[in-house]
């Protein structure tokens, strides 16, 4: 007896729920002991964005004091990071203050984890479904994107590894930025590889850019795809509106703080009393945050430098070398972006997405160094790793390739588990 369409639909939904539940369980079981989500804590005392949200509630832009990377400009202290986390904290603190005046401005940990980390498995799963994977394989790839990349140790900086590097990193803003950006990048992929509503890709761009500024370069494939839609004008308008909003708020905040919409304030971290000022001083005595001279060294670390492997009384250990480590060693799956280059190049959408990662990578390579918090991995690879995985997804599904991918996954999980104790 052939089941009715309604019965089949119910069965598919039940299977989908079970697969997602298993994906979340796998992430919790694998990452939980080292990431320690229950220990995540964020408040104005340990995070610049949270401190700025408190300042917004008081009707000001200035911070009460210097903590972490903050800008000292005209005698005032300002947050210099993109605004997404500030907006999230502002909404939460405003709501809790309205409900219970005098309540401490501390994020309720389960809700904090739910907003920052919980969307990623679901959205990564949908991104890989849109990329061409079936229901089961999309879950495997989503797990790889989380446990098989440096997203694992980056998230560990907020929980288990925070104690190893000092309490100031219990809400290390750089880690939170990378994690939030994954949500935005996944949404971009879901839309551009799916129905191409364009406003949804624009929303993903906003989330990613308000977390990591270099992700704004993904507006290039969004606008290019909008230009090539059958209803060009409508698609461009739907894409341009969120792109404009993405620019407007950070630009307005920059203008209000530093008098220039293009001035992020980052160079004002390095005032004359900052011991790291020498890192960014050029021959002219001025601060230079970007430079072509940084490219060779950073490129070597991102793509060539091997990890350090050694044996202790506890067994085999892997750690960083220099201290960054090339992405291929921890995540060998990315080698397929080179092996399958001709394949993804023939797909116009995948091609333009992959091409957009080139300026994203190059801007990161021009950034002054060293890159903090990257022992055994290179955290800037998170700005494009999800894009690369989506580009090669259709060619990971063959019988032979699946076994190769599973072997890569086993190695990657072992690798990032091994370095999870290295801040």
Language-model features, listed with the residues they occupy:
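Membrane-proximal envelope and lipid/glycan-remodeling enzymes
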Residues: 1-423
């Amino acid at each position: 007896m052939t089941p009715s369409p309604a019965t089949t639909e119910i069965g598919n939904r039940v299977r989908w729920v079970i697969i997602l539940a298993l994906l979340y369980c796998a992430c919790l079981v694998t990452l939980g002991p080292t990431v320690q989500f229950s220990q995540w804590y964020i408040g104005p005392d340990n995070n610049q964005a949270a401190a700025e949200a408190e300042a917004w509630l008081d009707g000001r832009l200035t911070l009460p004091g210097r903590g972490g990377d903050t800008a000292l400009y005209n005698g005032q202290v300002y947050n210099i990071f993109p605004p997404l986390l500030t907006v999230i904290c502002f909404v939460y603190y405003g709501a809790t203050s309205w409900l219970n005046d005098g309540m401490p401005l501390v994020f309720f940990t389960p809700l904090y984890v739910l907003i920052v980390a919980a969307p990623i498995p679901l959205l990564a799963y949908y991104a890989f479904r849109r990329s061409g994977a079936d229901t089961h394989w999309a879950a495997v790839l989503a797990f790889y994107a989380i446990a098989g990349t440096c997203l694992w140790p980056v998230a560990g900086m907020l929980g288990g590894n925070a104690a190893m590097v000092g309490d100031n990193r219990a809400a290390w803003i750089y880690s939170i930025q990378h994690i939030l950006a994954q949500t935005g990048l996944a949404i971009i992929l879901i839309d551009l590889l799916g129905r191409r509503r364009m406003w949804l890709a624009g929303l993903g761009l906003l989330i990613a850019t308000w977390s990591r500024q270099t992700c704004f370069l993904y507006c290039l494939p969004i606008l290019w795809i909008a230009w090539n839609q059958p209803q060009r004008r409508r698609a461009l308008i739907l894409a341009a509106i969120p792109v404009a909003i993405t620019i407007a708020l950070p630009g307005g905040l920059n203008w209000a703080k530093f008098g220039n919409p293009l001035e992020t304030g980052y160079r004002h971290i390095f005032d004359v009393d900052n011991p790291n000022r020498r890192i960014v001083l050029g021959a002219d005595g001025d601060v230079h945050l970007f430079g072509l001279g940084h490219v060779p060294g950073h490129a070597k670390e991102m793509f060539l430098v091997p990890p350090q492997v050694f044996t202790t009384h506890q067994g085999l250990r892997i750690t960083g070398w220099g201290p960054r480590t090339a992405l291929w060693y921890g995540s060998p799956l990315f080698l397929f972006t080179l092996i399958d280059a001709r394949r993804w190049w023939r797909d116009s959408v995948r091609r333009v997405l992959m091409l957009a990662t080139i300026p994203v990578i190059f801007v990161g390579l021009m950034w002054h160094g060293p890159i903090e918090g990257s022992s055994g991995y290179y955290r800037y690879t998170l700005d494009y790793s999800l894009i690369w995985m989506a580009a090669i997804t259709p060619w990971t599904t063959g019988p032979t390739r699946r076994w190769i991918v599973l072997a890569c996954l086993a190695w990657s999980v072992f690798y990032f588990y091994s370095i999870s104790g290295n801040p």
